[in-house]
Amino acid sequence: MTYEYDYLVIGSGIAGLIYALQVSKYGKVAVVTKSSLNDCNTDHAQGGIAAAIDSLDSFEAHIEDTYQAGAGLGKRQVITEVISSGPKLIQYLIDLGTDFTRRDPNYDICLENLSLTMEGGHTRRRIAYAADSTGHQIMEALIARCRKNPDIEIYEYNIAIDLLTQHHVVQDEGFIPGISCWGAYVLDIIENRVDIFKARKTMMATGGAAQIYSPDTNPKVATGDGMAMARLAGARLANMEFVQFHPTAFWSPDGDTFLISESLRGEGAVLKLTDGSTFMEKYHPQGNLAPRDIVSRAIDSELKKRGEKFCYLDATNVPAEQLLRHFPSINNMLKTRGIDFTKEPIPVAPAAHYFCGGVLSTIEGITDIHNLFVAGEVACSGLHGANRLASNSLLEALVMAYKAGNHPSNLDEVQFPCIPEWKVIDEFNENEWVVISHNREIIGTIMQGYAGIRRSRRLLKYALSRLENIYNEINNFYQHNAVRKEVVETRNMAIIAIAVVKSALMRKESRGAHFLVDNPERDDEHYKHDTII
């Protein structure tokens, strides 16, 4: 089938749905998402959204914290633009129906009545939150608005396969030179059918790719689809080596991993070794509230010294009532695993969490490809530099999507070429399914072992060789079998894993989330610039 819309939105997190709501004022919108609407990183976001709201805070302080966390690679103009937009757009979320936690629950919700918490790398309390399920509260409000909007049509369980660009069509005279996007080929997972979604403007808001690591804190959908499709279509990727590991993922022997919010440390929880000793004071003046890259490396270093697999996050010094009020979801998840975090410490270890790099773009989401926009974690806007400041991710996604969608587009100028139907292959070789299932696991093992928190050029080169062979196997299967969701995802994971390793090999220094044992120091003279592939 062929569908035609003014706007195609791929992805249904905060960035995708904010953009859909904004552009629905100007035309018809399709939102395509490969799972349910709320199965996204946004819905899993516990901590909150950062903004200089408090009278004791300032834009200047938030800007400086962001720049320092980014290890000198953040773009000051972009940082300033995002941070200065924060309070206004949090008010926008409130107006849409987001129920943030209030200082005084007896009074109406407004900026002045928002309860604010502290997280790593921040010098002020500036994190607006909704208990420990901020992302879920935001998604509930956005989904309700989108479902009621007559100009937004939602296609759940549909995965985008490829962007519709010049390499899919025969060019006619009169088209804009360079690469243009006219939508995407999309697999209807339930009907097992590839459809054409033609669109004058396409927004990719597909999130990150932490699934290329094992363990990670992300939902299973975070397979780097948007980054991979953009790369296949000819867009540039930037700063892919900067993969942030969250310091405190729940650790268990069976690999049952989930995020333990940074806000817990903001409220007073302390990292300890298994013998009960503290250690973060040795690594950074902010101790337990140091930026994430520093805390993750510190934990990794201490665990390697001792041959241990986890440390503890001890919140027993925080009043139990405060813990249960602020962190009900974490409490429930821990209780099902037999842990009472008001009385005993939580076993934690770092896990892959967030991509600071992505598709090279402006803060308005403009990419190398005409009529293709990006917003959120899929993008590299210049905000995060080499390491993201806690709770700046939802802020970036919100600001980018709002800016990209808050002006009329010249829709009439976009002409569709003749787009061929998807080449259908009926054969599906079940006997070779191991190419997909096995290699998906192997990618995670390779990336964790050879391109994780600490890297060496020798192991990165070894990883690249292995990953290129894996990609060739997956792509061969993809080319000769009927398309399936898992095949598309695993292809995308291999593409992004290779991009991470290639970028890491290009940066012969240590900076932010990229630590190279061969070159453990920062080198501003030679490497204070983006890595672009």
Predicted regions and their residues:
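Conserved redox-cofactor binding core of oxidoreductases
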Residues: 95-193, 198, 205, 249-252, ...
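Conserved N-terminal glycine-rich FAD pyrophosphate-binding loop of Rossmann-like flavoproteins
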Residues: 35-67, 71, 255-258
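Core beta-strand elements of the Rossmann-like FAD/NAD(P) dinucleotide-binding domain
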Residues: 2-5, 191-201, 368-369
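N-terminal Rossmann-like FAD-binding beta1-loop-alpha1 element of flavoenzymes
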Residues: 7-31
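Glycine-rich loop(s) and the adjacent beta-strand/alpha-helix scaffold that form part
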Residues: 201-258, 391-403
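Short beta-strand to alpha-helix junction loop
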Residues: 74-87, 126-144, 155, 216-224, ...
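Glycine- and aromatic-enriched mobile tails/lids
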Residues: 1-5, 22, 37, 44-50, ...
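An anion/pyrophosphate-binding glycine-rich loop and adjacent beta-alpha core
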Residues: 229, 235-340, 344, 407-413
